[in-house]
Amino acid sequence: AQRSPSLRLRF
């Protein structure tokens, strides 16, 4: 799993 700024909003 990659850490993306977009995913940071969800997680």
UniProtKB/Swiss-Prot annotation:
This is Short neuropeptide F-1. GO terms for cellular component: extracellular region. GO terms for biological process: neuropeptide signaling pathway. It is found in: Secreted. In larvae, both sNPF-1 and sNPF-1(4-11) are expressed in the CNS and ring gland but not the midgut or thoracic perisympathetic organs (tPSO) and abdominal perisympathetic organs (aPSO) (at protein level). In adults, both sNPF-1 and sNPF-1(4-11) are expressed in brain, cardiaca, corpora allata and thoracic-abdominal ganglion (at protein level). The modification Phenylalanine amide is found at F11. Keywords: Amidation, Neuropeptide, Secreted. Belongs to the NPY family.
